[in-house]
Every structure is written in C-alpha cells, then in structure tokens.
C-alpha cells in the first residue's frame, strides 16, 4: 500500500514536471487573450478603467494622458504587450528547443500583470472594480491578475536554469 502511494506521488510529480508548464501557459494566455476584445474595441468597462479611473488618478499626480488613448499605458498598448507575452509563452511551450522564448514571455507577462496588480491595490481602481453603472466585478479582474502573476512566477521558476545561465553570462562578461 505504501508503494502505491509513492508510485502515485512519483507519477504526479513526473506529470507536473513534463506538462505543468502547459497548464500555466494556457491559463496566462487565456486570461490575456480573452481580455484583448475589451482592450482593442474600447468596451465601456475598459474605457471606464483606463480613462475614467486610472487617467484622472495619474493626472492628479501630474501625468495626464498616460492611460488615455495614445498614452504610454493605454488599453491598446497594454493589450499589445499581453498579446506578445501570450504568443511568446505559447511558442515556447510548443517548441522544446525554444524554451528561452517561454522565459521571455513569462517575464513580460509578470511585468505587465505586476502593473495591473499595483493599480488595483494603490489607485482608486480598487480590488473590486465598480463600473460607471454601479455594477461590481466582485474582485474578478484582481483575482485573475493574481493567478497570472503566480503562473508567470512559477514558469520562471520552472525555467530558472535558462535565465540563471543568462544572468551568469552577464555577470561574468567583464571578469
């Protein structure tokens, strides 16, 4: 009976090592790609978040227009980065000899989603986004963002050999 438990643990561990990166990649890509429709079409929810909440907040700090259309952090710019990160993650997951691409996608995804989490926590946007019509998402966007952050961090941990090798090459270049 003990051997069966050990065998099951070993097979689960083996499955996670072989396929876990796919689960994480598909989750991140799903969250990022499904949000593109909202970001690229100027949906009322997206307009409210970027132009109704974040841009006035940034303007109060002297950075007017950064979240408005054409701004450096506009919905379309953020969506473009999410699309690129998703594509890099998917290509890197599908092609074993291109795992470095997955690392770049995970790092890019982690950076983008860290910004989203920051703006949920430290701006008037809030954890539970209350739309202009008074409806609330109940924290769904924030929870999805946290899931993406964890997934990207786990992917970077799973592929740590790649970026640690890069770091080693960079730090020993001048030695």
Residue ranges and their predicted role:
Residues 2-175:
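Membrane-interface extramembranous regions
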